[in-house]
Amino acid sequence: MKLHELQPAPGSRKERNRVGRGIGSGNGKTSGKGHKGQNARSGGGVRIGFEGGQTPLFRRLPKRGFTNIHRKEYAIVNLEALNRFEDGTEVTPELLLETGVVSKLKAGIKVLGDGELTKKLTVKAHKFSASAKEAIEAAGGTTEVI
């Protein structure tokens, strides 16, 4: 086989259908759009959720709730992830970022209690769940809110 003999796999490339190029093509004259009507026009067609003029579902249902513009999103760290550190390590947000436990600090770090903690660590974070705090202290470590 030579370079000039290379061909795409059969069926992997389909020729583009050019419409409006004569009736012999099967897609001439009206270009597959039928005669007149909304869908034959440029920009024709209805928007998503259109129900033929009937009040659509999204307008029949009431509005609910709001978006809290002051919402803080914390980077989540589970206890399991803290086992990678040596005994007696002071775990800070900077260390977690450095070691790749979290990819972004966001509004801070929140430690959650998923998994087992076997190491004695000093953990500094912005928030702790009750179960995480309990588990860290049970393992002989300390927690510090920053």
UniProtKB/Swiss-Prot annotation:
Q: Which keywords does this chain's UniProt record carry?
A: Ribonucleoprotein, Ribosomal protein, RNA-binding, rRNA-binding
GO annotation terms (biological process): translation
In this chain, the stretch annotated as Disordered covers 1-51
List S-S links within the chain. Answer: none
GO CC terms, sorted: cytosolic large ribosomal subunit
- A GO MF term: rRNA binding
The answer to whether keyword rRNA-binding applies is yes
Where is this chain compositionally biased, Gly residues type? 21-31, 42-51
Q: Which InterPro entries match?
A: Ribosomal_uL15, Ribosomal_uL15/eL18, Ribosomal_uL15/eL18_sf, Ribosomal_uL15_bac-type, Ribosomal_uL15_CS
Assembly and binders = Part of the 50S ribosomal subunit.
**Protein name (Swiss-Prot/TrEMBL):** Large ribosomal subunit protein uL15
**From what organism does this protein derive?**
Anoxybacillus flavithermus (strain DSM 21510 / WK1)
What's the source species' lineage? Bacteria, Bacillati, Bacillota, Bacilli, Bacillales
